[in-house]
């Protein structure tokens, strides 16, 4: 089996690429970073530091790399069995034209072999969004063939992969936590279902997507935003602050009440899942910076993302949301010189005031009680 993975960054190498290579799949990375491409093609291997209760170093071998712009990547799409991505939500649109060209070439070659494409991004139904971008780039006469032969498979991914603080300055070395979860929608595959250790198949993906979004992502973001406000450097420092921990755990319990109502999750199992995630935030081996985790606050405050979506669930079911609102107020305070979205957020609040700004970003009604509550919390932190 052959696979092409877009994105040779830390998540690509440390998570999805590692699982594919470990499964004995012939793997090629596609990226724009020439330093990483050259290193991969010189060595065809790299090291992954897996940190947690037991620290180990795994070697991933037998990998190749190509530029994600150019003919080579198009040729590969025409011949592989699986395409995966870990490029970040905003980059999906940029790689879509190359995928469209590769699919058109595949059709022109008369290939009948199914190909499945899985976007492994920190977003809801990322592959469905990628499919939209690909179809925008396809010629009209190719669309029916692609619909029949190409599976666009949505997934939920979960593994904390902080930027590597490699002492060796090796561009390929990566550190990951022990925990990992890759859940894919088995109803969307074309052809036989693959057997890849570490890939879990489900016919109820949205339950897992929202479980991860409402727990890991919600908790991670609120830890970062409250941590930044309190002057903490890392997620671990922040979650060990009892005041912050109480709000974060409270927010995850509030979002969890939505999940229990919506998907009939077992309350005790979900409480254990929350505790496991709090333990992951405490991992002393992960030097995860609050500024990195908090970046792109406009996206994280949008209606379908980790802060507002669980809040909307609490409003839908008439459930408490006090801690979620505190997290939203903290997100509105996020400032970073290195993040254009943080600067845009600050400018929007300065221009329109917190009430109108939050309503515009989140889609919440500016006159609603919940926006008033968030604005009160925001002003209390000034």
UniProtKB/Swiss-Prot annotation:
InterPro entries, sorted: 6-PGluconate_DH-like_C_sf (IPR008927), 6PGD_dom2 (IPR013328), Mannitol_1_phos_5_DH (IPR023028), Mannitol_DH (IPR000669), Mannitol_DH_C (IPR013118), Mannitol_DH_CS (IPR023027), Mannitol_DH_N (IPR013131), NAD(P)-bd_dom_sf (IPR036291)
Any one Pfam family match given in the protein's UniProt record, by short name: Mannitol_dh_C
UniProt organism field: Klebsiella pneumoniae (strain 342)
The entry's keywords: NAD, Oxidoreductase
Name of this protein: Mannitol-1-phosphate 5-dehydrogenase
Keyword Lipid metabolism assigned: no
Family to which the UniProt record says this protein belongs: Belongs to the mannitol dehydrogenase family.
GO BP terms: mannitol catabolic process
